[in-house]
């Protein structure tokens, strides 16, 4: 049955190539259509692999190649505008609890690893921009701008935030309803409050290996991660107005330089200023940051994964890892569907894709809520977030290290591959008991932890009533503060 089932993957980046690896494990036929001229272009970005993504990569036989390219993080130093700083052990705690280091490497290098490890490289095609998809009763038909056509039993949009597949899903839904798609409708739930500058620097003086440095101040957070071979990966989150957003779309290079030059005096540690990082920058980019969960993920034989269904700030470090989880979850459901002796019909495929969306949406909404809270807490946005970020979380000392692992609880794994030996005996079972065992070292600070619950609740009540923060976000606040210290900033 697997040989008769064909998947067309639109997009050849993290989500698309991860899915290709999963399908190879299942023996399912696939084609990857990438619109770019290269699979792994140098865009100046880094990527963070956390244990939930690392475990799936290990199941696919890829993680050791990733480990060869990284310098594992050991701890993070979080600095505030008033000069106060504290040290978080979250990277070491995650490594100990889940068996995988917090791993940072060049995004280009990671995508190249994914491509190089594929057996079926001949199934990956570049310069293939999809222009239309027809979802017929027997097959879906995909057309590209060079006139080529591909048929498929399923079409997966792994083509990012500006997904063509997602646009086609909306178009098909609206045509069926007899209405037109408005320009704003598909993106109605997406926020555009921040912009991100990211880059790579080399030989930054006084910046040690194995360390994350973060500087948090009003409206801006800067995060620096030591990589392998004297490389340092960094990103800046900056609050943007509508006018700045429009300017960024017109001239991102100029705005990136202006932003970075204006932050030169920001201290990342006693010895490292951002100007030290900027002066040794080799490549950088600036982009508006989308945040949120797209409303419709699937229709008929079409489905989206990765950034085509959700966008998160990089502070939480889960964007790529959730894309890898999507690939694994979708593969698990394909495997289950193809185990039936009957040929997969259009109805069967559509039901399977509905199940996929239902399974992933709960975790997605939780993770995106945490991400939205964290980026704003890092930027001192709002009384409650400022209280949590500047005073309560640092008072827990190393507590954020153990709390960080709670975001990994409930992570997906591949069902068609064995469990890696390095995860055995670790905190993967996803029970509250395992989470509590991770936090046992907090017993000396339980009084402080109780105070955090009380004060955080009061702070969230204040924000809900007086600052018109959505009740759902307020209710998640303490869960987010626990997870947030893992997310590239610790506080």
Swiss-Prot record:
Q: What is its main location?
A: membrane
Quote the InterPro entries the UniProt record gives: FAD-bd (IPR002938), FAD/NAD-bd_sf (IPR036188), FAD_mOase_fung (IPR050562)
Q: What does this protein need as cofactor?
A: FAD
Q: What is its EC number?
A: 1.-.-.-
Q: Which residues bind FAD per the record?
A: 34, 48, 107, 307, 320
Q: Which residues cross the membrane?
A: 448-468
Query: Pfam families given for it?
Result: FAD_binding_3
Give the pathway listed in the UniProt entry for this protein.
Secondary metabolite biosynthesis
Gene Ontology MF terms in the entry: FAD binding; monooxygenase activity
Give the membrane topology: Single-pass membrane protein
Tell whether Oxidoreductase is among the UniProt keywords. Answer: yes
Q: Which UniProt keywords apply?
A: FAD, Flavoprotein, Membrane, Monooxygenase, Oxidoreductase, Transmembrane, Transmembrane helix
Output the Gene Ontology cellular-component terms: membrane
Where in the cell is the protein located? Membrane
Query: Per its database record, what is this protein's job?
Result: FAD-dependent monooxygenase; part of the gene cluster that mediates the biosynthesis of paspalitrems, indole-diterpene (IDT) mycotoxins that are potent tremorgens in mammals. The geranylgeranyl diphosphate (GGPP) synthase idtG is proposed to catalyze the first step in IDT biosynthesis via catalysis of a series of iterative condensations of isopentenyl diphosphate (IPP) with dimethylallyl diphosphate (DMAPP), geranyl diphosphate (GPP), and farnesyl diphosphate (FPP), to form GGPP.
Q: Which family does it belong to?
A: Belongs to the paxM FAD-dependent monooxygenase family.
Protein known as: FAD-dependent monooxygenase idtM
